[in-house]
UniProtKB/Swiss-Prot annotation:
The gene is thrS. Catalyzes the attachment of threonine to tRNA(Thr) in a two-step reaction: L-threonine is first activated by ATP to form Thr-AMP and then transferred to the acceptor end of tRNA(Thr). Also edits incorrectly charged L-seryl-tRNA(Thr). It comes from Pseudomonas putida (strain ATCC 700007 / DSM 6899 / JCM 31910 / BCRC 17059 / LMG 24140 / F1). Belongs to the class-II aminoacyl-tRNA synthetase family. Residues 242-533 are annotated as: Catalytic. Residues 1-61 form the TGS domain. This is Threonine--tRNA ligase. It comes from the Bacteria. GO terms for molecular function: ATP binding; metal ion binding; threonine-tRNA ligase activity; tRNA binding.
Amino acid sequence: MPVITLPDGSQRSFDHAVSIAEVAASIGAGLAKATVAGKVDGKLVDACDLISNDATLQIITPKDEEGLEIIRHSCAHLVGHAVKQLYPTAKMVIGPVIDEGFYYDIAYERPFTPEDMAAIEKRMMELIEKDYDVVKKMTPRAEVIDVFTARGEDYKLRLVEDMPDEQAMGLYYHEEYVDMCRGPHVPNTRFLKAFKLTKLSGAYWRGDAKNEQLQRVYGTAWADKKQLAAYIQRIEEAEKRDHRKIGKQLDLFHLQEEAPGMVFWHANGWTVYQVLEQYMRGVQRENGYQEIKTPQVVDRILWERSGHWSNYAENMFTTSSESRDYAVKPMNCPCHVQVFNQGLKSYRDLPLRLAEFGACHRNEPSGALHGIMRVRGFVQDDAHIFCTEEQVKKEAADFIKLTLDVYKDFGFSDIAMKLSTRPAKRVGSEELWDRAETALADALNESGLEWEYQPGEGAFYGPKIEFTLRDCLGRNWQCGTLQYDPNLPERLDASYIAEDNSRVRPVMLHRAILGSFERFIGMLIEHYAGVFPAWLAPTQAVIMNITDKQTDFALEVEKSLNGSGFRAKSDLRNEKIGFKIREHTLLKVPYLLVIGDREVETQTVAVRTREGADLGSMPVAQFVELLTQAVSRRGRQESE
C-alpha cells in the first residue's frame, strides 16, 4: 500500500501499485489532463509507470522545464513517425533534445529539401490531430533486436550493440512506428501541437566525418502556441540581426572559400576591431598587465612538453622545415610560460601578469564554421597571471571586477558566473583542489553577485570560473574564463625563488574577457543589430552639404572632428540631402551633420541622429562636447 508524498507535504495512500497518471487523476481532472510525466524520488518516469512503494512524487506538466524537454523529445519521435510514413526506406538514427528544440538524424538516399521538410511538418500535424496515445513497452533485449531487424533499422541495431549491459529497453509506439528510448515521453500527441520544424543540415554517424553522412532535421517545440509564436518572433529577429548579413550591409568583413574560417576585415570592420583592441590594451595597462608578443609558429618539441601534441594535434595546423616539425599555435599559454622562464623570478616579482593579443589557428571542421563566430583563425585577448597560491583569491577577485566592468562598457549587464569544480578524472591532491576551489569561490562571493556551481565541470588540472553574457534576444554567450592551472608550470618547468630561497612552482591563471575578437565582434553586431554605440561605430559622424557652396565648410568641419580624435567623413556628392540622410541612416552612422547656407553663415552644423531625432543647429565645439559625452559613456546607459 504505497503512500505518495507530494511537493506540498500532503500524502495520498493507495491500496495497490499506482501510476503517475492515476495519482494525478486523484488530485483533479485538470491536473490529470496536463500530466506529461512524473518525478519519483527525484527520477523522471513516464505517466504510465507504476509506483509500488512509498515515494515522493512531483507531477510534471508542460509548465515545468522537464515537461518541456519531454515534449521536445517526443516531437523528435513524431518526426520519425512522419518520415517513415513519407519515406519508408529512410533509416532512423538518433533524435535528442537540444537547447530550445530537438533534431533527428536520418539516413536516406538523397538530401532532404525544404519541400521535404514542409511535407514532414504537415504530416506531423496530421498525426497530432489523430490524438493517439504514445504506448511504452519495456522490452527484452532479444525482442528489441527482432523488432528493429524486422524493420531494417540498422542504426538502431548498432545503438543496441552499444549497450551490452541493458537487458530490457523502452520501446515507444506511435501507432505503427516504434522508437527506442530511455524516456520519459508524453502519453498522448495532444501535448505536441506547439511545434515547428526549423532547418535541415548534414551530419555524420557518431559525429565523425569518416562515417556515413546523414540528414538532420531540426525543430522546436513549446508548451503552447503562444510560447511558440514568441520563439518564432525571436528567431526572426535573430535572422534580421545575423552578423553575416549586417557585416555585408555595413561593409565590415567577408569570408571566402579560399580561406575557410579566416576573416577578411574591411576598413569599417577593422576600425571596430582596432577600437576593441585599443580599449582592451588600455584596460590591461591600467590593471597591471604587461603586453607581450610571442611567435605564431613553434617547434613541436614545445607542444610535446606542454601535452598539446598528444592531446590536441588533430586541431593544429602543422608544417615542416629543414627536417623539423612545427605547429601554428592554437593557443598562447605555452609561449607565455617561455617568457616567464626567461631570467630568474623571485616571489617579489609575483603576481606577474602577461597579456597578448595572440593570433591563434585551430583546424576546426569545415561544417562547424559559422561566419566570424566560429573560425579557424582568431585573436584572443589572452593573459596569464603567474602568482603564488596565496595570491590566487585576490587576483581572481580583481579579475572578476575588471571583467564585469568591461562587459558593462559593451552594454552587457546580465552576466551569469559559474564555478566549475573537480571532475572525476583529475590530477593533484584533494587538499590542492580544496584550496583552489575555495579561493575562487571566495573571490566570487566578494563580488556580491549571484553565482552557481557546476560540479564536475572543471578541467582535469584545476577549477575555473566562466562568465556567460545574455544578449538582447535572451541568448547566452560564454565569453570570459579564469582557469586555475598548476599543471602547465610543472610540465614546462616554471619556478620562482620563494622567501626561504627554495624553488617553487607558480600557479598559472589563464584568463580571457572577450574570448576571441572575432566572436565578440559577431556578438556585438547581433546584440546591437549593427547600431553600434558611438564609441564603436566605424564612422561616428558624417558631414553632408546641400549644395557645392558649402563644400569648403563641410571639409573644415570634417578636419576639425578628425583632429579632435573622432571618426568623421564628409559626403559631398551631388545628391539630394534627403537621399544622403536615408543612405547614412541605413549605414547606422550615429550623427548626421547637415550644412546649408545658414550653417555656413552662422558657422554651425544641423545635427540629426540615426534614430531621426533633430537636435537642432549648434556650433562645432558644442557638437564635439556632445560626441565626447556619447563616446565616454561607451555602451552604458546615461543613468549608469
